[in-house]
Amino acid sequence: MIEASKLTTEFGSLVFNDKIMKERLPKDIYKAVHKTIEKEPHLEPGCSYSCSSNHEGVGNREQCYHFTPPGSSPMTGLTAEKHDSFISPTEDGRSSWSSQEKSWLRANLMHQASQWWSSCHNSSMRGYQHGILHHHAFIKDGSLLLPTAFCSYGGEALDRDSLLRSMEALSNEAVKMMRLLGYEDVNRVNTTIGSEQEYFLIDKDFYKKRKDLLLTGRTLIGAPASKGQEMEDHYFGVIKPKVSAYMHDLDEELWKLGIPAKTKHNEVAPSQHELAPVFETANIAVDHNQLTMEVMKKVADKHNYACLLHEKPFEGVNGSGKHNNWSICTDTGINLLDPGKNPGENIPFLVFLMSVIAAVDEYAPILRLSVASAGNDHRLGGNEAPPAIISIFVGDELAEVLKAVEAGEAYKAAGKSQMTWEQQYFTFTKDNTDRNRTSPFAFTGNKFESDGGHSSVANGKYGPQHMQLQKEVATLNAKLSAYSGDELKEKVKEVLKETLLAHKRVLFNGNGYTDEWVEEAAKRGLPNLKALPDCMPYWISDESIDLFTRHGIFTKEEIYSRYEILLENYSKSIHIESLTMQEMIRKDLTEGLVAYEKDLSKEIVQKKSLLDGDCCALELGVLKSLDKSSAEMGKALSKLFEDTKKAEGMTEALETASYYESTVLADMDELRKYADEAEALIPEKYLSYPTYGEMLFSLR
């Protein structure tokens, strides 16, 4: 346990951070590193050697025998590592602690990049991991993890390269806008992200007995427990002692890695919890979230828990998401999404707000795709997560500001209201907007919050969002660049009004869960893309390809490869679920069902031989219900088997994914209905796997 007095010194103690670099690197090297981070694309060879030598020294001093890239996240969305030893043999048969400069900054050759690239490409393709300086090296499990980006042999981006490129492109255009508006001291604009990570904890022994959780991350069968989340007593409730101990250890491990974990609490569903960090620059936040999820699972294992990060591990209760708080900030400290005291006169705020509105409206299908997956599609559109229809909530105050913009009038602020209630001890003002949990993209004071994010993968898909915003800012720049002074002020008002009129259909402050909104959205022409296959044609549209290739974020080949990979991953996920479900029904559930029916039948026969009249009414009723469910289950199982076989023979990616979504998933839902009916009647002692009641309500 970290003592409170040592917390500040322990924070980042496993990181080769700026403080350490300043202490250990020669002054000229340290300055060169910072220059590279801020402006230059490459580090000089001599500087790279010095950095590598210092990394070697860190590894030696901290007894790290291996080094590896820090969990690069290739196209599967999963962590990838390749560990190499610092040890090198010498001519006299001994070994030396060797600097590995080429393995970090000059390129680390990886075998089989095609495993992450696409099965449609050359299977012998190799890949490289090249060093980057925007991230710090750190120590994990006895290895020194060195910051890299992963690319294929041909230079195609496979992980964070596209995010870094998009951030650079957005910054360039945003800086141009800020200087046009008179902010000459702005040299860089970054996006920031704070990701609220939801997760479930269950007993590890229960987890090991569930094939579906082990193989797919979610339960494929399971009758609901007698109690769910209807009492609303878990959200922000008192954290149970053993869970609190887990959270405490998790905080300490994250703090040592320099991850600013801040908030922890119980979530809505039983056994569901949340961890939230302080916001960071987008690329750092994405990497830290990837690392956080890995650490969460490892710490859970030490506490005899299993940490479930799937978006919908349990039917009938809320699933998990990643609530991403996203903003735009200058290097001079200006939050461009902060309305300030007078939002109607805050021109930078209005310009970037309008750019966001235009980007969300124009590229809604791509935003929907960024949160689409086989797991997350179970959650979106239900009364627990934002709908699949992309809209923006701006709150009451900003709605009035936008009305003034549209009318060409000055906005008159109503003033902040005071919070008052009986026995009030302090006076404070209300926020300028409430939170709307039914909106997929909600303004929350000085940022946008997106509740639709995946809980199981990091936020690496922010690259497209950055480019959508970059395109809209560039459009405004083109319209305004010829003006200055008072003419510029008037032209800004004109352009803002023009942009708002073109895109205001995407604004919606109401309840996104209602059928009325679905009807209204259709009238407005907003797309309702219910699953990943519905989104994919938009990804390879001419408009999308032009957006990403124009600034080198993706090549056309990279776009099409992602198209194939996303569809392939979607189909494979559902295919594995189908096979796992069939196995659990045939072996695990059927075994318990038959054993119980056999014992129940014997009991009925024995009682009828001893008793007169209408005895065994209860037992007969249960037996008949089991027999009926069993018969329907058999039919549904056969249909799922046949339809899965048909899907296995399909070759076209979109057609296959669409078939899995429309047919195989529907078969699984039908089969589950009868399986859950049967399970609800079978005593727990007959089942070889734990029930919902055991898993969700056993933590202490």
Swiss-Prot record:
Keyword ATP-binding set for record: yes
Q: Which branch of life, at top level?
A: Bacteria
What SMART domains has UniProt attached to this entry? Answer: Gln-synt_C
The segment(s) forming the GS catalytic domain are 159-589
| Binding residues for Mg(2+) 1 | 196, 323, 472
Function summary: Catalyzes the ATP-dependent biosynthesis of glutamine from glutamate and ammonia.
Annotated family: Belongs to the glutamine synthetase family.
Annotated protein name in UniProt: Glutamine synthetase
Question: Which organism is the protein's source?
Answer: Butyrivibrio fibrisolvens
